[in-house]
């Protein structure tokens, strides 16, 4: 029974790529083919290899490190490290779905200072075999290849579809999706333009990062009522998920961040769920999938509550 193996050995077996020239690898692959029908597994692709994963999959977004909230940014970072430490015993995949930082820009030879505790913990988890998926958000879309190389992890700039166990997940940060918000959609194209990125890189980091933080704070002040559920007719990511579910009926979960409100909502097809991960500035919310069911949960925030529908 493979579930009786020590977990570090299982993780090593599952993370190593399949080698068709290795008889041991072939035997393990056949064993897993029989066993996976009786346990949770994930198949993901990296560098054209198939990986088998065991255990739980975690999703979180919108840490917005660099700005204070219910806790200071430094205290929130330590809290995130505690959360990662508590889930490391059963986490085989972690999706960080955008806006990890309130602002991030990678110069050719410099990155924003700070965040060493979080980055160190993520590196530790990667070295232990935990699969990590990073997404850019609207606050850290200028994340290039630094974290990709240092953490040996993919960075997604658009939504992706991943199969986890026997469930299909549509995952993305959520910015620029759905109806309306044409001003931001235009601005996003400007920010994604290579010429604009080159021009910003010409600014001294002290000035460029300070300017970006100023506009980030202004944007937050203009969206201070984000924690109010607007109803299915006005929640644009819910509307987007509803339309997408009609085009992609095999998707079980649409998972987004960006909205800053934990939401678990059943779509009109009575099968697919729209999940918003909330944020960590106030809610400390995240989602966990155990192979059968996905739930929203709260870390060190017992009064946290999600919008259910």
Residues covered by each model-derived region:
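Active-site-proximal loop/helix segment associated with metal-binding centers of metalloenzymes
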Residues: 174-236
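Conserved beta-sheet core of the metallophosphoesterase superfamily
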Residues: 150, 154-157, 170, 175, ...
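Active-site environment of divalent metal-dependent phosphoester hydrolases
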Residues: 66-68, 102-105, 134-145, 177-179, ...
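Core catalytic region of metal-dependent phosphoesterases/phosphodiesterases
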Residues: 51, 55-56, 60, 65-164
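Structural motif
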Residues: 164-165, 289
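Conserved catalytic motifs of the protein kinase core domain
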Residues: 56, 93, 167, 252, ...
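Short, low-complexity, charge-dense intrinsically disordered segments
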Residues: 1-9, 14-46
